[in-house]
Amino acid sequence: MRDRRSSYEYEDLLACGRGELFGPGNAQLPLPPMLMFDRITEISETGGAHGKGLIRAELDVNPDLWFFACHFKGDPVMPGCLGLDALWQMLGFFLGWSGGEGPGRALGSGELKFTGQVLPHVRKVVYNVDIKRVMRSKLWLGIADGWLSADDEIIYRAQDLKVGLFKQTAAKPAA
């Protein structure tokens, strides 16, 4: 049975990372430190900019987050690729939540724009993913647009994010 709530707390996200939320072998979030949000505040198969669903999540920012210590020394900033990865994580979660089977993989994105930075003084990051299309066949493919805001200012925009769920992706042991 899949967990179909409309919001999820941090412990739920950790359960997803352990493969406990959508069943063994299905969509998982990464575990910390690569899990890039603290809660999912809204998820729905309706609504969003395209009327086909949305997912919204938040990250509480503090100067002790792991990436500030190494990116960059004396000039701390959250790497833009981590914000992009959060959007892919959310799209994969949406596919698992929607009933897709198999582990997820990011497949790409269209246009991506960064117009600001997540710095240690930022209090909250909000991520939003608006579903454009979900293809359900052997491969489940989600296509969406997303944005990231830092303290209520949108600073990243991504178009045509793509994530797929694949029934067979397990790494084969080296010969």
From Swiss-Prot:
- What compartments host this protein? Cytoplasm
Please give the catalytic activity noted in the UniProt record: a (3R)-hydroxyacyl-[ACP] = a (2E)-enoyl-[ACP] + H2O; (3R)-hydroxydecanoyl-[ACP] = (2E)-decenoyl-[ACP] + H2O; (2E)-decenoyl-[ACP] = (3Z)-decenoyl-[ACP]
Q: Which GO terms describe its cellular component?
A: cytoplasm
Q: Which domain of life is it from?
A: Bacteria
Tell me if Isomerase is a UniProt keyword of this record.
yes
The entry's family comment says:
Belongs to the thioester dehydratase family. FabA subfamily.
The name this protein goes by in its record: 3-hydroxydecanoyl-[acyl-carrier-protein] dehydratase
Q: What is the lineage of its organism?
A: Bacteria, Pseudomonadati, Pseudomonadota, Alphaproteobacteria, Hyphomicrobiales
